[in-house]
Amino acid sequence: VPNLRTRERIPELMDDPGLDPAEHRRALAGLARLNRFSGSVGALWPSVRALALELKRPVRLLDVATGSGDVPRALLARAARAKIALEIEACDISATAVDEAARETSAIRFFAHDAVRNPLPSGFDVVTCSLFLHHLSEDEAVALLANMAAAARHLILVNDLARSRFNYAAVWVACRVLSRSPVVRFDGPASVRSAFAPAEALNLAERAGLSGATVRGRFPCRFLLAWERR
């Protein structure tokens, strides 16, 4: 297990624009399995549900860096079971990811967008992001958080890996058990080495102007950063 006291950004194979589209799609499927196993939706849903009950109207949600769209699809399914009206849009910088996501459902509008370098469309109640923050430099992460906050009327939620030796070992094993994709098997452990510790994530939120943001650990291997507009 490498020394994880400090962050070490490791270029991930899925970020390579030259990655074969078929291999990219296999990796997206593997990542979706890991998301189901690790409870990405379970981290986000309680806050989304609470906001819906408070607003007493349909909630508009934007999911950023959505990948294959598995997280917003699962949120939509939970909302349907709870009889909560949820209107979702989702974006990703990758055209391959957007095409793959759109193939799975017509109930969510997917679009290509660089959420770090360009402002996000406005008018959303909540803006979410899962497993993307660790791909970014500190300055890029601050820009992303600021863009998310500017687009959100009420709430932003960022669900990401937390850097620790235990989490590195757990992700290494999970990637080999849950996926045969060589991209996932490389990128998973690399992601933990690139990840922020919870205290570092809170510092990024403060730099982005998110006064009152909170960061809480989530089992397994994650933290949830939340900020509510006051």
For each of these PLM feature ranges, what is it?
Residues 152-161:
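Conserved beta-strand signature within the Rossmann-like core of class I S-adenosyl-L-methionine
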Residues 161-208, 214:
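C-terminal alpha-helical "lid/dimerization" subdomain adjacent to the S-adenosyl-L-methionine
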Residues 136-147:
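A short, conserved alpha-helix within the catalytic core of class I
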Residues 1-17:
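N-terminal auxiliary segments of SAM/dcSAM-dependent transferases
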Residues 128:
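A conserved beta-strand element that flanks and buttresses the S-adenosyl-L-methionine
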Residues 213-230:
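Core SAM-dependent methyltransferase catalytic element
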Residues 17, 21-47, 51-52:
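Class I SAM-dependent methyltransferase Rossmann-like catalytic core
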Residues 62, 68-117:
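Class I SAM-dependent methyltransferase SAM/SAH-binding core
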